[in-house]
Amino acid sequence: AIGSGWRAGDIMYKDLDGNGAIDRGEGTADKPGDRKIIGNSTPRYNFGLNLSGEWKGFDLKLFFQGVLKRDYMASGMMFWGADGGKWQSMVYKPHLDYFRDDPNHPLGLNLDAYYPWPNWNDSKNRQTQTRYLQNAAYARLKNVTFGYRLPSHFTQKFSVNNLRLFISGENLLTFTKLSKMFDP
């Protein structure tokens, strides 16, 4: 069985094989217990797109890159916060959205939380599950370059054939549904 001592604020798992227990079965494809395939972490449909244009000495180049389909099951302290004992845990603002059923708690009541109650000593709430399976598809503006080519009649006065001034930026925008704690 997966875990014991269940309480309010724990994740509820479905008994898929109907045996009355939440378990991993025999861990085989024929007898997987209450597990099933819920995603695919392999990036599918990778893309890159170059766009460029010029007008009266000005030029603009854009490079987009991304993945159109990918599933991600977050794990570890960065996602869960309270994981691995009180001396090895980290807490960021999103981790404060955890289950609290005590109206006198300093952070207040939170019965509709994103995270289960924090538990350092038990991984039962951190099993692979659809609740925390994330869409890791993204599109990123990897590079933008904006430039201006000075007219040759001006540059030749300084014995220069060609002079271009430009400004460039990297990773300026990312569009994703992935949790803000992660960079796709």
For each predicted feature, which ranges?
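Extracytoplasmic gating/loop element in the C-terminal half of outer-membrane beta-barrel translocons
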Residues: 4-8, 19, 67-164
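Hydrophobic, lipid-facing positions within transmembrane beta-strands of outer-membrane proteins
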Residues: 45-51, 58, 141-146
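Membrane-embedded beta-strand positions of outer-membrane beta-barrel proteins
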Residues: 62, 165-167
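Flexible, surface-exposed loop regions and adjacent strand-edge segments
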Residues: 33, 77-87, 178-184
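Structural signature of outer-membrane beta-barrel domains
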Residues: 56, 67-71, 151, 170-176
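Repeated loop/turn-to-beta-strand initiation elements of outer-membrane beta-barrel proteins
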Residues: 57-62, 153-154
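Extracytoplasmic loops and strand-loop junctions of Gram-negative outer membrane beta-barrel proteins
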Residues: 28-37, 42, 94-96, 124-132, ...
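Acidic, glycine-anchored loop motifs typical of Ca2+
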Residues: 15-33
